[in-house]
């Protein structure tokens, strides 16, 4: 009897880890660091023209800062307390909200309609798209001069037209609501075409086969618009709403030029928050309170942005849930319908079998109407 012994194999030598070369290290650094280097100029520029002025404005708001005398004593949050107790600040904020609502809501509605019309197969499409952008190209000063003459109380075009119908002239500059409507009209005329082009670009990105499928299924133009177009451009609508909110809360040029003599009106009936900030800084020369108003306006804009984000997120979540529910319902309906069809087919097969003989009914001879034969 022989016994064979296997010799233990020698352990494999440990793999030596090669040291990466300088070129390899440079390639790894390029892959990891190059994305940050590409976006670094934006953040550097944002820090210089955005974060630094924001922080410096907050620093100024903590002092009794005069335009000519410069930095005064440290007052802490006293400027915030005094501004929040100032009735002129709340009046300007109320005027800003009123003009914002009168301008943003009609502006978005008209922009959607104009974009939907331009999305059709029109002749000279480029001409019409360029035409609606002309009000945005015109300088705000020219727009303010035109609309100031139109809304003139004595010789304005609007009051002359109303007078031809026997309507008394409206005091566009001395009453609160008419002045807000006039300023909102200026804003709408200037920004509606710009927003319409943004919405038009979103509408053109919607696949056309979806509209064709909906038309084949019998959906009309309005049904396709509300069921396909509006849900598809929801992200763009959110962008337009956010930008309109920021611009509406920072409105300055239109109310400033609407009545150049009395900025904001004789009774501050259309003085906005930014216009009140300008008055506090350059007429009262109180940079501390002006910086405080700027910071409060910044916080209000951030609050409005968060509210818009939460509302749009809620709408998107609800729409996705409804879409999944409809899809699940169609799947369940198709499964149930298939089971029902199988059940009906099985029932027909059972009914087609003669219960006495077990043979199919079509093979059983019919004896109806015959008399049995006798054995004779």
Task: Please give the residue ranges for each predicted region.
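Transmembrane alpha-helical segments of polytopic membrane transport and secretion proteins
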Residues: 1-38, 123-125, 309-376
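A structural signal for multi-pass alpha-helical bundles of membrane permease subunits
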Residues: 31-323
């Amino acid at each position: 009897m022989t016994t064979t012994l296997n010799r233990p194999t020698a352990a494999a030598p440990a793999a030596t880890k090669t040291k990466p070369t300088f070129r390899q290290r440079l390639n790894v650094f390029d892959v990891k660091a190059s994305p940050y280097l590409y976006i670094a100029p934006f953040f550097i520029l944002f820090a210089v023209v955005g974060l630094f002025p924001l922080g410096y404005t907050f620093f100024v708001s903590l002092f009794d800062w005069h335009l000519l005398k410069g930095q005064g004593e440290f007052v802490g949050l006293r400027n915030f307390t005094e501004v929040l107790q100032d009735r002129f600040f709340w009046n300007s904020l109320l005027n800003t909200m009123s003009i914002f609502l009168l301008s943003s809501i009609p502006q978005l509605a008209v922009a959607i309609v104009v974009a939907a019309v331009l999305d059709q197969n029109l002749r000279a499409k480029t001409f019409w798209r360029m035409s609606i952008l002309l009000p945005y190209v015109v300088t705000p000063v020219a727009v303010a001069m035109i609309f100031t003459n139109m809304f003139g109380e004595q010789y304005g075009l609007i009051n002359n037209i109303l007078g031809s119908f026997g309507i008394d002239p409206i005091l566009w500059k001395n009453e609160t609501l008419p002045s807000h409507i006039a300023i909102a009209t200026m804003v709408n005329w200037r920004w509606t075409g710009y927003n319409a082009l943004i919405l038009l670009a979103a509408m053109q990105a919607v696949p056309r086969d979806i509209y064709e499928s909906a038309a084949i299924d019998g959906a009309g133009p309005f049904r396709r618009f509300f069921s396909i177009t509006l849900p598809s451009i929801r992200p763009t609508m959110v962008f337009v709403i956010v930008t309109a909110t920021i611009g509406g809360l920072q409105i300055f040029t239109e109310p400033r030029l609407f009545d150049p003599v009395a900025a904001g009106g004789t009774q501050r009936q259309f003085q906005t928050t930014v216009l009140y900030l300008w008055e506090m800084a350059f007429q009262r020369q109180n940079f501390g309170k002006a910086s405080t108003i700027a910071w409060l306006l910044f916080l209000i804009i951030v609050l409005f942005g968060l509210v818009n984000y939460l509302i749009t997120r809620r709408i998107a979540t609800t729409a996705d849930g409804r879409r999944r529910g409809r899809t699940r319902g169609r799947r369940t309906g198709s499964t149930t319908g298939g089971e029902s069809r199988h059940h009906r087919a099985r029932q027909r097969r059972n009914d087609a079998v003669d219960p006495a003989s077990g043979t199919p009914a079509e093979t059983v001879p019919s004896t109806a109407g015959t008399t049995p034969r006798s054995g004779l």
